[in-house]
């Protein structure tokens, strides 16, 4: 019974490793395909993420954080 349980656990771990590595490899392949595709290098714009970050904190943000911390 112990041997069967150990074999089951090892099989589950190996299956999980295979499933996760497949997802990682497909994501890397899609990324490389998008970069080295026909228009991939022309459309490469790394500044798109700058719009998501606002480095300035307004007074309203500080007041809101103070209310949260009370």
Swiss-Prot record:
Compartment list: Secreted; Target cell membrane
S-S pairs: none
- Which range is the signal sequence, renumbered to this chain? 1-23
| Propeptide, chain numbering | 40-70
- Keywords annotated in UniProt: Amidation, Antimicrobial, Cleavage on pair of basic residues, Membrane, Secreted, Signal, Target cell membrane, Target membrane
Please give an example of a GO cellular component term from this record.
Answer: extracellular region
Using the record's annotations, give every residue carrying the modification Phenylalanine amide: 36
The main location class comes to secreted
Describe, from its UniProt entry, the tissues in which this protein is expressed.
Expressed by the venom gland.
Q: Which domain of life is it from?
A: Eukaryota
Q: What's this chain's function?
A: Amphipathic peptide with antimicrobial activity.
Give any extra note attached to this record: Negative results: does not show antiviral activity.
| Similarity remark | Belongs to the non-disulfide-bridged peptide (NDBP) superfamily. Short antimicrobial peptide (group 4) family.
What is this protein's name? Peptide Hp1035
Q: Can you name the source organism?
A: Heterometrus petersii (Asian forest scorpion)
């Amino acid at each position: 019974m112990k041997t069967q349980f150990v074999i089951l656990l090892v099989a589950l771990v190996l299956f999980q490793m295979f499933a996760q590595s497949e997802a990682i490899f497909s994501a890397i392949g899609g990324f490389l395909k998008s970069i080295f595709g026909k228009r991939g290098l022309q459309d490469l714009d790394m500044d798109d993420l700058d719009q998501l970050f606002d480095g300035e904190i307004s007074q309203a943000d500080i007041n809101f954080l103070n209310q949260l911390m009370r």
